């Protein structure tokens, strides 16, 4: 005979396992401003204004997205708050250019090109040639310094050299390494130069007024073997009269790049400082020759902080360099030390906990958990 229904319910309720949770309700605070769509009367949606066009809706949505709100979006909440106005500019002031005169000059050049019969004929016959040297000179004079600044920020030069302070390289700095008698390897803004090509001091040229004083620095930002935040100074020429680098005081003799094997690309930066007056750099002088790495330990930030009242960064050029066979000769013959070799040790691959019965797994499943690299079931 079946038990009464109330007995079944009673016995079932006694054996029922209750549900519990450790979650707690958070206290809801009043919003800091009006919430989205709180002015809409949801009880009568028919009276709402109809857009009747997707274009109207899109324009209204874009206008609403551009309007300031009291809440922060996802990008604003997780994005880095970096205001370019907060950075310190330690460079030369921008040149004073009359915008009206500049526009008039451009219009004059366009008018001459449009009225020139020779230019029209060369363009029609596709025989026109563009003077690249003039184009580069115009680029250096107008937007080139700002492009160089963006490249230096991308490579982290300002962050590592001046602790975040920035400057616009107003003075074009041209650096080239001589290979043989005729070939030159130029240094631009991040190109690769091998240690073999940079074995000898480069040719450095720039435009300078007669009577001005300059300082030229070559430093390795990534090559220090003991201190992660230190640099190696490879060349330092101070009190340069005008653009005659050979007549300056070689405070630190030139040392070829020696990026250690396995350490990847190193950043080498040429910095040109403009001096207000002759400066005494006796405290920064290194012996000649200088093959002790401890004596070449350098901090550009401390060097500039020490002489910031008398000089201003004005020019910049940098290249990337990695190991080749000539670095071994530098370590053994010049530095008289054993060559360090680095290797990137990859982390071990992650494998989940081994199952006792790996259902529907391939045969090589067991190879993941063996100490040796020999396959369990041969080659397959």
UniProtKB/Swiss-Prot annotation:
SUPFAM superfamilies linked to this entry: PEBP-like (SSF49777)
Disulfide bond in keyword set: no
Name this protein carries in UniProt: Large ribosomal subunit protein mL38
Pfam family name, one: PBP
Coiled-coil annotated residue ranges, if any: 101-122
Protein family (similarity comment): Belongs to the phosphatidylethanolamine-binding protein family. Mitochondrion-specific ribosomal protein mL38 subfamily.
Species annotation: Bos taurus
Keyword terms of this UniProt record: Coiled coil, Mitochondrion, Ribonucleoprotein, Ribosomal protein, Transit peptide
Lineage: Eukaryota, Metazoa, Chordata, Craniata, Vertebrata
Cellular compartments annotated: Mitochondrion
């Amino acid at each position: 005979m079946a038990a009464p229904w109330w007995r079944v319910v009673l016995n079932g309720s006694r054996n029922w396992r209750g549900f519990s949770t450790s979650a707690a309700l958070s206290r809801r605070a009043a919003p800091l401003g009006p919430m989205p769509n709180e002015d809409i009367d949801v009880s009568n949606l028919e009276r709402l204004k109809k857009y009747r066009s997707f274009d109207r809706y899109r324009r209204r949505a874009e206008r609403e997205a551009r309007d300031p709100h009291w809440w922060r979006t996802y990008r604003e909440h997780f994005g880095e708050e970096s205001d370019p106005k907060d950075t310190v500019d330690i460079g030369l002031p921008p040149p004073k250019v009359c915008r009206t005169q500049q526009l008039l000059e451009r219009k004059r050049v366009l008018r001459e090109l449009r009225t020139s019969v020779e230019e029209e004929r060369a363009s029609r016959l596709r025989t026109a040639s563009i003077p690249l040297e003039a184009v580069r000179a115009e680029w250096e004079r107008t937007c080139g310094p700002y492009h160089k600044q963006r490249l230096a920020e991308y490579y982290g030069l300002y962050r590592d050299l001046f602790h975040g302070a920035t400057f616009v390289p107003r003075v074009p700095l041209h650096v080239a390494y001589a290979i043989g008698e005729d070939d030159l390897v130029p240094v631009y803004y991040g190109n690769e130069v091998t240690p073999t090509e940079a074995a000898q001091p480069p040719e450095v040229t720039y435009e300078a007024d007669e009577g001005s004083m300059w300082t030229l620095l070559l430093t390795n930002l990534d090559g220090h073997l003991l201190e992660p935040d230190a640099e190696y100074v490879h060349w330092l020429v101070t009190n340069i009269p005008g653009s005659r680098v050979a007549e300056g005081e070689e405070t630190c003799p030139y040392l070829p790049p020696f990026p250690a094997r396995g350490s990847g690309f190193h950043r080498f930066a040429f910095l040109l400082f403009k001096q207000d007056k002759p400066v005494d750099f006796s405290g920064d002088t290194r012996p000649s020759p200088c093959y002790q790495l401890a004596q070449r330990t350098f901090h550009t930030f401390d060097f500039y902080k020490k002489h910031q009242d008398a000089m201003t960064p004005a020019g910049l050029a940098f290249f990337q360099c990695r190991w080749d066979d000539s670095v071994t000769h530098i370590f053994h013959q010049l530095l008289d030390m054993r060559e360090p070799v680095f290797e990137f040790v990859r982390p071990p691959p992650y494998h989940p906990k081994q199952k006792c019965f790996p259902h529907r797994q391939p045969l090589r499943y067991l190879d993941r958990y063996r100490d040796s690299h020999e396959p369990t079931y041969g080659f397959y």
